[in-house]
Amino acid sequence: MSASNVLALTTLFLATMFAETEWKEFTSSEGNFRVVFPETPQQQKGTERNLHQFSAAAGAESYGLTYADYPPGTDWESVLNTERDSIVNGFGGSVVDEKRTSVEGYPGKWIRFVGQNTSGELAIYFVGHRLYLLHAFAPKGTPRPENFSTFLNSFLLLSKPKA
């Protein structure tokens, strides 16, 4: 078998092995959101701040969404910065890019960071009194997965929260 045939077969094998995962829409009426995950997410619930966590993996990539409720009048930017710092520092990392963003008119931040072994992106929004934190993580040194955008850009609110 020629070298070009071996290369073609290897490429075909790898393309099949790493074929795109069919992402699934996940809706939480209690959380008032919809997002796509690479598989049905695992769910955890905490008691503090009505904390809810949803997570799923696609190979070495990890995707998650957490939401928590804060008292009315909470300084949203302070909360977002605290969450950003906690996650980035937890990975022994540093922020390499940060931008203000929004979801349906509610303020947020998009953050890209690199840690000791992990690189990732965060999208954090403050909607009324609720914080939504989306994360996408991959091993450090791998090219940015296209799935990061698939996940982070899929987040939508089901309805405007009551004031």
Language-model features: where?
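Solvent-exposed coil/turn segments that connect beta secondary-structure elements
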Residues: G31, G59, A68-Y70, Q116, ...
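N-terminal secretory signal peptides that target proteins for export/translocation
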Residues: M1-S2
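A short acidic-to-branched-hydrophobic micro-motif
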Residues: Q53-N81, L133-H135
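Short acidic, Gly/Pro-enriched loop/turn segments at secondary-structure junctions
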Residues: T47-A56, S159-A163
